[in-house]
Amino acid sequence: RRGYYGKIGDRTVIKNSRIIKDTWIGSDAYIKGANKLKNLTINSEPGAKSQIGEGCELVNGIIGYGCRLFYGVKAVRFVMGANSQLKYGARLINSYLGDNSTISCCEVLNSLIFPAHEQHHNNSFLCAATVLGQSNMAAGATIGSNHNSRGADGEIVAGRGFWPGLCVSLKHNSKFAS
């Protein structure tokens, strides 16, 4: 039933937040200045405290243990693995963000992002990506730029329907559907 389910764990701190509805929050979480938290599970515990900061709007998602979300990020229909971060206006929509990943200043839609992903420039993918199926990549994206290796190590695997935007740069070797 809508508007009925919610839980706040032990030692959780919530300050200056506008809307919190149908949200389960684990212990030791820290939430300050969030605009909207709706229909969420925020996993948090003493050894892996999750934090949500100023201006965040999060709807229909699961946030893993030890995650940090700050500075006006927006996420809708999403899952974040443990110890992941969204920062500086990033948008995560209809996507899964793997463990130990960081996304800043950019938009990720309809994506399966594997663990240890770092995306910290506008419209850039700086690590290996698996993009399968009917997929689209933002204009100006850069795939693989010596951040995880200097050798050709299969930076991108793209399946049927892969559609890169204008000025996309694919560095190192790549595998595409035939």
For the regions a protein language model found, what residue spans apply to each?
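Domain-scale signature associated with acetyltransferase and cell-envelope carbohydrate enzymes
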Residues: 1-134, 138-140, 144-161, 166-169, ...
